[in-house]
A protein has these predicted regions:
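The feature captures the catalytic groove of carbohydrate-active enzymes
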Residues: 253, 323, 327-342, 394-445, ...
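Sec-dependent N-terminal signal peptides
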Residues: 4-13
Length: 761
């Protein structure tokens, strides 16, 4: 049943997206203007050592949500490293823990037999999701590589401008950065087939991955030349293209590389089939790009915003067999940092923060499936494993779910808790957002509410009810940060607050659990406040800030005490002005005075910039600090710090939040944008509204709202104190209510509405 309604939800999104993309001229003009900035260029060969990474990709990369590729070159060759997201070994041990670990699969190397010459050029083309190379050889060869969507074909199209045929060698190999895993190689009817196998002793499961390669368009020979390598040779003719087609198969936990199935598919491969695969890929990416976009007026900011969309859509989508970790589908070393895991104390959630407002919510589907897969083990741990969190919890047993920090998408935890209990509740915002941004009640009923209730069950049992003054309060003692042990850290209180707010809201919508609401309300009323202190580190502005726990812990890095702003959203632009000002003070103290926004390793991934936008923090500072980080991006346009990857896409949510926020179900246009022109197209807001607007630096010049579900649409008057009208797509004025600068009207699904300054005519 779950798969059935998930299919319906995704189908509805796809239909909506198709309708949304019918602005061909405007969209086409926008993307053509961005083609250059979304093309990364190398004009010299780059070696394996230059792109070798145990974290984010350092070279040209592409992905389809299941397969990842990273390239390196010589003047006459290209090697495409290949990984598969569900190729995971058991039994790997390092400082981070023992258990599951993601591995690379192998690669495909294409070499040109021609002396060195001028003209080497390599281009990673994000808009078309392909990587193009011209060899630096006297007989130049053009290689265009791409991945199919939903089917794991890696295709390289070869052509030459040489007047004579050019000899080509293709090597398909299995392996990674070590030789400790099993591998095989064979040929069958000139199809190369290699496999790699995970550890086989003292393990819970075994996985195999296969790479099978066929040459289309040229007579060829295939020979096994090593225990993990098959070599094809052929002549590339100037008259026609030749295709190197590799099908990646296997993965999972059933010790099966699925070579017979791969062989069967490649025996049928043809140039016509390849064209169809390319067309399917091009359509998918065109739709993905057209979902939404922004114009910030700053080429550096625009570049990282849009390249982040490319990174997200390459790493995760509805075709992913399992959810990738912090490094998406690019696990290209046998010793990936943190096992290439899903880090549950913010890192991996941060990779999905932007997909909702960016109108690509289905990209989060693999993550939901992973979390649901972990619930049974999480329930066992809450009952039986509390002492592993902290010795003081020995003998304690809770309902609900308890997650450690680390897991792999195949459905296995590994490693310690680092004394934290927020790793399951950290997913509450993500589950709520899919419903809030799409209006999908099936998702709310069958997926979001059950998970959020598990977190509520845990908190009901874990919180301590204690006397406080003339009343009582519900306190929490937990690790607010990794390996700390804190009384009432705001980082965790915000998740408690959000969890019970959502349970009250959603239980009313679904008409369930009425008998539990009194307890939930009581907890909300009696939660401790956030500790306020004067800064203890210099320099500072001498203004009050939020501490990290009730004892007044002041560590100027990682603004975890502002989870209330984001991702929990229990503090917003409508909150008490004094509380909001203290939040801004905290951001300035940690982020500017103490240089945290750019000097701390991952404040971007930690959503500090989103927190700034949600608090109304100085937008010029936010933009300047983001640009400082973006300016340090690599040639492949990724910001890297040796540890993180996907969460750097929080630039997208930061910019979106500066341009559009849903504040207590009211749309605010450009709530934290500086006095300079900007625009956004089809950003998704809570309530299922797709919003487009243009700002000239002084006032909003246009606003269009499309309803994907029926309901009341509320927006803050963009022209405060002036009359407003709303017209539908036929120009008919709709009934509008206005109260204290908040305008509202009833929107119908599938209809668009223009918000206009009323001329009085």
């Amino acid at each position: 049943m779950k798969r059935y309604f998930l299919f319906l939800s995704l189908s509805a999104l796809a239909a909506t997206a198709f309708a949304e993309s019918r602005l061909p001229e405007a969209d086409k003009a926008f993307w053509e203007s961005k083609r250059g900035m979304l093309t990364a260029v190398w004009q010299q060969p780059f070696s394996y050592e230059s792109i070798r990474s145990k974290h984010a990709p350092l070279g040209p990369y592409m992905g389809n949500g299941d397969i990842g590729c990273v390239a390196y070159t010589a003047y006459n060759s290209q090697t495409l490293l290949v990984s598969k997201v569900d190729f995971v070994t058991d039994g790997w041990s390092d400082w981070a823990g023992s258990g599951a670990a993601a591995l690379p699969a192998g690669g495909v190397r294409i070499s040109v037999d021609s002396p060195e010459g001028p003209g080497f050029d390599y281009r990673m083309k994000m808009l078309s999701n392909k990587m193009d190379m011209t060899t630096g050889t006297q007989n130049p060869v053009q290689m265009s590589s791409w991945l199919s969507v939903g089917k794991n074909y890696l295709v390289t199209e070869l052509s030459t401008t040489s007047r004579e045929p050019v000899r080509i060698t293709v090597e398909t190999y299995a392996g990674g950065s070590t030789g400790i895993y099993g591998k095989t190689a064979k040929t069958q009817s000139r199809i190369a087939q290699v496999t790699r196998r995970t550890k086989t002793e003292d393990v819970e499961w075994i996985s195999q991955v296969g790479l099978s390669t066929a040459i289309v368009g040229a007579e060829n020979e295939a020979n096994v030349v090593a225990d993990s390598l098959v070599r094809h040779t052929f002549w590339l003719s100037p008259e026609a293209k030749t295709y190197v087609v590799t099908l990646v198969s296997g993965g999972g936990m059933d010790d099966n590389a699925r070579l017979p199935e791969a062989y069967s598919q490649l025996k049928k491969i043809s140039e016509k089939r390849i064209r169809k695969l390319r067309q399917e890929k091009d359509r998918w990416w065109q739709d993905m790009w057209n979902r939404s976009y922004v114009e910030t007026g700053d080429s550096l900011l625009d570049r990282h915003y849009l390249s982040s969309i490319y990174l997200l859509a390459s790493a995760y989508n509805e075709h992913s067999p399992v959810c990738g970790g912090m490094y998406g589908v690019w696990n290209m070393d046998d010793q990936m940092n943190y096992h290439g895991d899903i880090h549950l104390n913010y890192n991996s959630q941060g990779g999905f923060y932007s997909v909702f407002s960016a109108n690509r919510p289905e990209l989060a589907m693999p993550f939901y499936e992973f979390i649901e897969k972990m619930v049974p083990e999480g329930k066992r741990r809450a009952r039986e494993d509390m002492a592993s969190v902290h010795p003081s919890l020995k003998g304690k047993s809770c309902r609900g779910v308890l997650f450690p920090v680390s897991a792999l998408g195949i459905g296995r935890f590994y490693g310690p808790y680092w004394q934290q209990t927020m790793d399951a509740p950290f997913n509450v915002p993500l589950f709520s957002w899919y419903y809030e941004y799409t209006g999908d009640r099936d998702f709310l009923k069958n997926r979001a509410y059950p998970f959020i209730r598990e977190c509520g069950d845990f908190y009901e049992d874990y919180l301590t009810k204690e006397l406080w003054g003339n009343s009582y309060r519900y306190s929490i003692i937990t690790g607010g940060h990794e390996n700390s042990w804190d009384l009432n850290p705001p980082s965790d209180l915000a998740f408690v607050d959000l969890t019970f707010r959502l349970l009250l809201k959603y239980s009313n919508i679904l008409d369930v659990d009425a008998d539990r609401r009194a307890k939930w309300q009581d907890i909300l009323i009696h939660l401790p406040g956030y500790k306020v202190i004067m800064p203890t580190k210099t320099p500072n502005e001498g203004l009050p800030v939020y501490a990290k726990n009730e004892d007044g812990w002041d560590a100027p890095s990682h603004m975890i005490q502002l989870h209330a702003l984001y991702p929990c959203e229990v503090m917003n632009l409508n909150s008490d002005p004094d509380s909001l000002q203290i939040a801004r003070n905290t951001i300035y103290y940690y982020g500017v005075s103490q240089n945290g926004l750019t000097g701390t390793m991952n404040e971007l991934g930690l959503s500090a910039f989103v927190m700034g936008a949600r608090s109304g923090f100085d937008p010029n500072i936010l933009i300047d600090k983001m640009k400082y980080l973006i300016a340090g991006a690599g040639k492949n346009l990724l910001i890297t710090d040796g540890h993180h990857c996907l969460e750097k896409t929080a630039v997208v949510e930061t910019v979106n939040s500066m341009m559009l926020q849903s504040v207590d179900d009211v749309l605010w246009l450009f709530p934290d944008w500086p006095a300079r022109p900007a625009s956004f197209t089809r950003l998704r807001a809570k309530g299922g509204f797709l919003v487009s607007a243009r700002y000239d630096g002084t006032q909003v010049k246009s606003c269009q709202i499309q309803a994907t579900v029926s309901g009341r649409c509320q927006f803050r008057n963009p022209w405060k104190g002036q009359p407003v009208r709303v017209c539908d797509e036929r120009g008919r004025e709709v009934a509008l209510s206005v109260e204290k600068n908040i305008c509202s009207f009833m929107a119908k699904a599938g209809h668009s509405y223009m918000v206009q300054l009323h001329s009085g005519e």
